[in-house]
Regions:
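N-terminal auxiliary interaction/assembly segments of multi-subunit proteins
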Residues: 1-321
Length: 321
């Protein structure tokens, strides 16, 4: 069994190296080294063991964890930082844990798919690379991908490092830094108005409360994360609602409004979003005027009904999510 697992790891490592070298056009630094027998519980000081991606295979378990320094670097990058956060002697925050859980879940899904696929097929590098590219980490994924894979069987550990250099593509330094998901898509929110409430007031909102929202000058605001990209006006294309771009911002950081009322959302590849220009139509994937979705601190938290108070647009909260 140890030989079978070793063969699997070597095939997986080879496919990763081949695929990612082609995808990023850079040499992947990959090192496989032996590690003495260490119980998982003894690794807690140096790695992020919870959450972690666990892949169950026949006779062995693959536990995907992040070394502490790399964990802070990856989480800082995913949360909008520069990825240079130093190791800190503090627990990971709830937000960091949630981001790490999502990251690990996607990786675990990919590895599980490969394991199931490879259980009845030859694990040759070309086939592994082909399947790996179709399992959630497609070629062209532009992000810093730093991970440590710990593979255990019968109390023996083998540690594989996969450390990919920063992509030479400029997305990590561009306007959409960290705004895209694992598939390279950006969720754009089309706001019909935002409130002047501060964060503390927004957290106290409940059912029945009315939030007055002021529409931005010129139309609707199209936003990706904290970045405002353009003002738009709504219209229709067939049976779909669309936003027509009136003018374009250069991804200026406007901050996240405490409360924003949405006309709808659209998920688009980040390259397409970067190319949006005046006069373009952005067809919305989801539109809903009744009830109106309310974003609180950048997250969908409530739904409400549009009302008018003294000629001002407002939303009465009907449901908390």
């Amino acid at each position: 069994m140890q030989t079978a697992v070793s063969d699997f790891i070597n095939a997986f490592a080879s496919s990763c190296s081949d695929l990612l070298t082609r995808a990023l056009r850079k040499r992947v630094v990959l090192q496989v080294e032996e590690m003495s027998s260490v119980p998982a519980s003894d690794l807690s000081d140096t790695v992020l063991t919870a959450p972690a991606a666990v892949v169950k295979g026949p006779g062995c378990t693959i536990a995907v964890v992040l070394e502490r320094q790399l964990a802070f670097s990856v989480l800082d990058t995913l949360l909008g930082g520069d990825g240079k956060t130093a190791v800190e002697n503090r627990p990971f925050s709830d937000v960091e844990q949630a981001v790490a859980a999502s990251f690990m879940e996607k990786l675990a899904d990919c590895l599980n798919s490969i394991w199931r696929w490879g259980s009845d097929k030859d694990l040759v590098p070309d086939k592994m690379a082909e399947y790996f590219s179709e399992s959630g980490f497609s070629a062209g994924k532009e992000m810093v991908f730093l991970a440590v894979l710990n593979v255990s069987w019968d109390k023996n550990w083998r540690k594989m490092y996969i450390c990919i250099p920063d992509s030479d593509l400029d997305v990590l330094e561009g306007e959409l830094k960290n705004a895209f998901d694992a598939d390279g898509n950006v969720t754009l929110s089309v706001e019909m108005g935002s409130s002047s409430l501060d964060a503390g007031e927004a957290r106290q909102l409940g059912i029945g409360d009315v939030v007055c929202v002021a529409p931005p000058e010129g139309g609707l605001m199209v936003r990706a994360g904290k970045k405002a990209f353009c003002l738009a006006q709504s219209g229709a294309v067939g049976d779909s609602v669309a936003a027509s771009i009136l003018c374009r911002y250069e991804g200026q950081d406007t901050g996240t409004p405490a409360v924003a009322a949405l006309l709808g959302t659209a998920k688009r590849p980040w390259k397409e979003v970067l190319n949006l220009d005046t006069g373009d139509l952005l067809v919305l994937d989801r539109t809903r005027m009744s009830p109106v979705p309310l974003m609180v601190a950048g997250q969908l938290k409530a739904e409400g009904q549009v009302i008018v108070i003294d000629k001002r647009l407002g939303v009465r909260i009907k449901k908390l999510l």
